[in-house]
Amino acid sequence: MNYRVPSLKATALAMAALTQALTTWDAAYEKALADLASLTQSEKVGVVSGITWEGGPCVGNTYAPESIAYPSLCLQDGPLGIRFANPVTAFPAGINAGATWDRELLRARGAAMGEEAKGLGVHVQLAPVAGALGKIPSAGRNWEGFTSDPYLSGIAMAETIHGMQGSGVQACAKHYILNEQEHSRETISSNVDDRTMHEVYLWPFYDAVKANVASVMCSYNKINGTWACENEGILDTLLKQELGFRGYVMSDWNAQHSTVASANTGLDMTMPGSDFSQPPGSIYWNENLAEAVANGSVPQARVDDMVTRILAAWYLLEQDQGYPAVAFDSRNGGKASVDVTADHADIARTVARDSIVLLKNSNNTLPLRNPSSIAVVGSDAIVNPDGPNACTDRGCNVGTLAQGWGSGTAEFPYLVAPLDAIQERSSGNGTKVVTSTTDDATAGADAAASADIAIVFISSDSGEGYITVEGHQGDRNNLDPWHGGNDLVKAVAAVNKKTIVVVHSTGPVVLETILAQPNVVAVVWAGIPGQESGNALADVLYGDVSPSGKLPYTIGKSEADYGTTWVANGADDDFPEGLFIDYRHFDKNEIEPRYEFGFGLSYTRFNFSNLAINIDATSGPTSGAVDVGGAADLYDSVGTISATVTNVGGVSGAEVAQLYIGFPSSAPETPPKQLRGFQKLPLAGGADGVAEFELTRRDISYWDVGQQKWVVPEGSFQVYVGASSRDIRLDGSFTV
């Protein structure tokens, strides 16, 4: 282990600059249609059907036809690395990637994940994630996605897809749609109005489709009473017609409930082709689909459309040109015959480092300045004594938390614990390190009592509902720290006047007890940082870089402040909050958060000046023809807004300039302000830079339910530019 600060190498930057293969959808469809003519009916239904659970080396495998040169597709999780394979890179989770607010890093992370997937022979990587979006702060899988804000989620989805598909792997946007909790996820109906669907939950999928995503995964839940994977309004009307999606829709694993209904409403591929039992059951397609065509229940044209979409996506990514063979077996330990990790540890470390959010820093306690002694307290500071991969699918919270749990995980090739990195630094500067690596409050206080500085590590975990951890069935039962974290901090802070708290968490944690301790002088949110956890944290704690992460969600003073929680006892969720989730809810109801959306401190200071608004837009609905991503004129530029950001401190740092827009009164009720632009500016001390935000018609439109179109309203739009959703430094307006 070393403590150099990595930089993205030229190769990584080159990967990040990629968009995707040069083939167009039209050219891909031409090739797919030529192949279609050569396939038998048996081969067609094989292309659209999984081989059944554990029927091949990957978590999903399709049948390979003999009539054309087309393989058995390998489909494999996941959103932070390749599941059931080793060695691979265990990247920071999506929620950390979102917290970087850095387009280049989002794309570089996606490119590196895609490169590893292709190297292992994975054709379809089951990522990225826009659902769960995060309307429920305790929801189990929020960490797989990027943020609770639809605009930021959409940008993160697009950048990640460009990175992944630029490396040659098919991306899969998931979970489509309204899969916002783990409790009862396979029976719950998410009942939502049309405007909320479009402006909140569908918004990031617009960006995914616009980025030419190859595939979309429909979710387990029902939507307005009908299963997502046989919901014509969701699969056909919205996705394929309104958004102009030209790829294919696959089911989540065992989320299909019918043969005919799923086929006729827009499902294109069933995964894994059966349920999880042995011998396999619930085989809805393959021969059963052929029979449904033969008896007239499913039109032949629908099956041909399924096959064409799947083949076209394969051609779009040019996977017909020397694609690697599958190099691992999920069911046999996952040991790969090739090492695909390259220099990706540098990217993982950079994302983890630049996602760290400094929440509190009284008296400039951080960065550390070679203290004579440090107490490191808490089980979250060390690697699980049984190893970082001891629990299947990371289904435990033992040792430092660097992944959530469930199918969206990967095997750690190694895990650098915070204590390891701190000890490495301390050995070079003469700092004595004392430890208490349990969560026992008395032992923690004993270790901290005589130290110059105490660093307490606490965590809060969550994951997928098929695993229950410490009584949490995927979703968290509350927003408290686990393992008595509040009591641990109280005990340490009672005896040490310089107590620093580091939080590893899958989502918001209520920090009121911790912040009430006068001796808690700094709080660091480190999220779900992946394999380079300790190194990234040390880079920030010791001042090698200034923290530049910003919260991808709001941290409230209580769980009740959010106005949403997961629905219990098998009931449906009627989404009564509508458009008003996370900061939109806090703003509407004038609730003071503890730390607002977009918040994050630095070791330097930034000023904002010179707001310039150059917008020229006309009111009214979209009128363009539907293209990939929706109505073509939806993405027309209406001008720019810019501001100057100056680093007025003495050290280098990076500021995220954020643009929020408030709609005129002529529009239906909307959130007081909505994120509509951001730019991360790295600036040396004394330097300045210009943040420029280009707005499209979509950015200043609302969804008109009556017209079924996006509409730009007349009137005065409010412009807010600042360092967070509530730290507004400049404001102005423009009129349409």
From Swiss-Prot:
GO BP term, pick one: cellulose catabolic process
Active site location: 252
Top-level EC class: hydrolase
Pathway given in the UniProt record: Glycan metabolism; cellulose degradation
Enzyme Commission (EC) number: 3.2.1.21
Location relative to the cell: Secreted
Keyword terms of this UniProt record: Carbohydrate metabolism, Cellulose degradation, Glycoprotein, Glycosidase, Hydrolase, Polysaccharide degradation, Secreted, Signal
Similarity comment text for this entry: Belongs to the glycosyl hydrolase 3 family.
Signal peptide: 1-21
Gene: bglL
Alphabetical list of InterPro entries matching this protein: Cellulose_deg_GH3 (IPR050288), Fn3-like (IPR026891), Glyco_hydro_3_C (IPR002772), Glyco_hydro_3_C_sf (IPR036881), Glyco_hydro_3_N (IPR001764), Glyco_hydro_3_N_sf (IPR036962), Glycoside_hydrolase_SF (IPR017853), Ig-like_fold (IPR013783)
Function, in words: Beta-glucosidases are one of a number of cellulolytic enzymes involved in the degradation of cellulosic biomass. Catalyzes the last step releasing glucose from the inhibitory cellobiose.
Catalytic activity entry: Hydrolysis of terminal, non-reducing beta-D-glucosyl residues with release of beta-D-glucose
A Pfam match: Fn3-like
Assigned GO CC terms: extracellular region
SMART domains reported for this sequence: Fn3_like
Glycan attachment sites: 224, 295, 363, 429, 607
Domain of life: Eukaryota
PANTHER family noted in UniProt: BETA-GLUCOSIDASE (PTHR42715), BETA-GLUCOSIDASE L-RELATED (PTHR42715:SF28)
Name of the protein in question: Probable beta-glucosidase L
